[in-house]
């Protein structure tokens, strides 16, 4: 696995482990910072995953591997490329074969190149246009720029099924779940495991994750009693925050979502 990663990163990954990628302690720079632009400028463009990694590797490392935690979308791009390198199949095929089909999911998929729409009935998503300052419909977009870091499409009920079946040992082994839950405490997330966040709720620890793409944000978790909740909103915090560049303002915009998660899982 390490040899495959070293080939993908053209030698830059010789000291980075898969665990560090999953736990965001790799030190890889954020590719979205390297290609930062308004989604309104690139919504119709297809981007190749390899280009994202190249853009990230053109920048200096954020820190030495294993030194600290910093959530970085680049880690998921590398993991997606690593899956394709090792299996000789596309990421979408692997997700379908290993997750979607075994769980009988009908509305969960990784969009194919050029697919800019959400299949079936769906809510519209909105993003603040930096030019006009207004919230505008951004539902139709090419999600390739997020790829393994956030391009998946699903429904709330199927996300709940996925999370429950992963954490109860149906989809992966109990030992793998235990490894995923070996976490480190962070300033920005309660506890971060291997692609899992441990949320400290009023009724105990809930395990889940979530994600954002312009126009949509999700937060999901499985509570101590095995119940699952997924919350979706149709604008990300930076789009509705009073100060889109201020951390406190963004955090305040996200807080009601976290409170709703606690209320739904704990009945508080």
Task: Pin down the residues of each PLM region.
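A short acidic/small-residue loop/turn micro-motif
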Residues: 143, 236-238
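Active-site micro-motifs of SAM-dependent methyltransferase domains
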Residues: 3, 7, 101, 237
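Short, surface-exposed loop or secondary-structure junction motifs
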Residues: 9-212
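Short, gly/Ser/Thr-rich active-site loops of penicillin-recognizing serine hydrolases
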Residues: 239-268
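Residue-level structural signal for beta-strand termini and adjacent loop
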Residues: 210-212, 219, 234
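Short beta-strand segments enriched in hydrophobic/aromatic residues
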Residues: 83, 166, 224, 232-235
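Conserved hydrophobic/aromatic "anchor" residues
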Residues: 1-4, 162
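Short, surface-exposed beta-strand/loop micro-motifs that present aromatic residues
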Residues: 206, 215-228
């Amino acid at each position: 696995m390490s040899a495959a990663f070293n080939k993908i990163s053209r030698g830059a990954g010789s000291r980075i482990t898969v665990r560090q990628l999953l736990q965001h302690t790799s030190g890889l720079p954020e590719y979205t910072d390297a290609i930062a632009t308004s989604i309104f400028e690139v919504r119709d463009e297809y981007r190749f995953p390899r280009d994202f990694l190249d853009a990230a590797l053109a920048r200096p490392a954020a820190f030495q591997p294993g030194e600290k935690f910093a959530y970085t979308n680049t880690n998921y791009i590398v993991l997606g490329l690593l899956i394709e390198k090792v299996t000789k199949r596309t990421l979408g095929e692997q997700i379908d074969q290993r997750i979607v089909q075994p769980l009988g999911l009908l509305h969960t998929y990784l969009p194919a190149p050029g697919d800019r729409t959400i299949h079936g009935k769906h809510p519209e998503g909105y993003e603040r246009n930096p030019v006009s300052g207004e919230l505008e419909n951004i539902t139709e977009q090419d999600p390739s720029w997020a790829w393994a870091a956030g391009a998946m499409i699903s429904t709330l009920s199927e996300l709940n099924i996925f999370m429950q079946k992963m954490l109860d040992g149906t989809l992966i082994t109990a030992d793998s779940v235990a490894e995923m839950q070996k976490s480190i405490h962070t300033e920005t997330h309660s506890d971060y495991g291997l692609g899992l966040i441990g949320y400290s709720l009023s009724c105990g620890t809930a395990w889940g994750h979530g994600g954002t793409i312009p126009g949509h944000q999700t937060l999901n978790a499985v509570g101590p009693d095995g119940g699952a909740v997924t919350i979706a909103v149709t604008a990300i915090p930076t789009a509705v925050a009073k100060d889109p560049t201020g951390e406190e303002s963004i955090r305040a915009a996200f807080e009601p979502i976290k409170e709703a998660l606690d209320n739904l899982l704990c009945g508080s």
